[in-house]
Amino acid sequence: MSDRTPPLIDCHTHTGFSDGTSTFEENVRAAAARGCRVMVASDHLTLPASMDPLCEASVAEADLPAHRAAFEAARALAAELQPALELVYGFECDWYEGCEGYVERWAAGAAVRLGSVHWLGPAGIGGATGAPAGDMAGAPHGWIDDSGDMHLWEELGADGIWRRYAATWCRACESPLAFDVMAHPDLPARFSREGWAPTGDLAPLWDEMAACARDTGRRIELSTAALRKGIGDYYPSAGLLERFVRAGVPVTFGSDAHRAQDVCHGIEEARRHAWRAGYRTFDMPHADGSWETVALG
């Protein structure tokens, strides 16, 4: 890498409107203090009641106007604190069977949409209200990243989770939804050091994921969140990241911060990691929904 310093960006942050602990204002102050140039506010988009009945993990539909108003107030604050800081309105949008109409409605007005997979199996969508439907009782279904509820891991095993996840992730890539970035692409690695490491070879699944991202024109996020989980690698891990590089899949960076203190965490080192993996550019979003390709060094 050259001595030129690329702009510091963070495309993945959360607030207390979803499952974070900080406010928009606190995140903005943290980003400004760290010299961030672009920060995407990407709370978890509203979910059907069958998946998040108490709105513990996502922005409640009734709170969407207040969410946008709080964002706009934070954007005004950013302009005062650090005029070079661009605050971008976005959401992290879970993909699940039948989500398209919900995402289009609830994410209207978002400049950036992060696509992600946290849920496997039927979502139990019963209609416009998101009331549970009968398909919830059949096939295995549930969250894969909830340490308080590991029933799906216990039922399918680590290898089964990985196979189902890769297939679901590819379906998310193939969705007609305009996902700008696929967030934390190998999320099942979250529990790999807690007794849930796969026993099979992940290389064929990684090959499929890289080919799918390439063929559907998706970007991927290099996320520093895995480092804070004690995994010892990024999302995606080195083997999958190298496949994305070879496939020509563009990359961007995110912390997945759920606390203000984690905004921009590890992004500078993540840029160096991307360079070592073979990337020479990264993509940076703007508030108008456009993206700019920037040299890594």
Language-model features: locations:
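Non-catalytic positions within long, well-ordered alpha-helices that form the structural scaffold/packing
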Residues: A32, C173-S175, V245, W275
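A structural motif
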Residues: C36, A110, L177-F179, V249, ...
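Extended substrate/RNA-proximal surfaces in nucleic-acid metabolism proteins
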Residues: E61-D215
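An N-terminally biased module of ancient metal coordination in phosphate/nucleic-acid-related enzymes
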Residues: M1-E97, A128-A131, A189-R193, P198-A203, ...
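Hydrophobic residues within beta-strands of alpha/beta enzymes
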Residues: M39-A41, R113, M182, I220, ...
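Mid-to-C-terminal alpha-helical segments outside catalytic/metal-binding sites
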Residues: D262-G297
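Conserved, mostly hydrophobic/aromatic
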Residues: H12, A31, R113, H184, ...
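Active-site-adjacent C-terminal substructures of enzyme catalytic domains
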Residues: L202-V263, R280
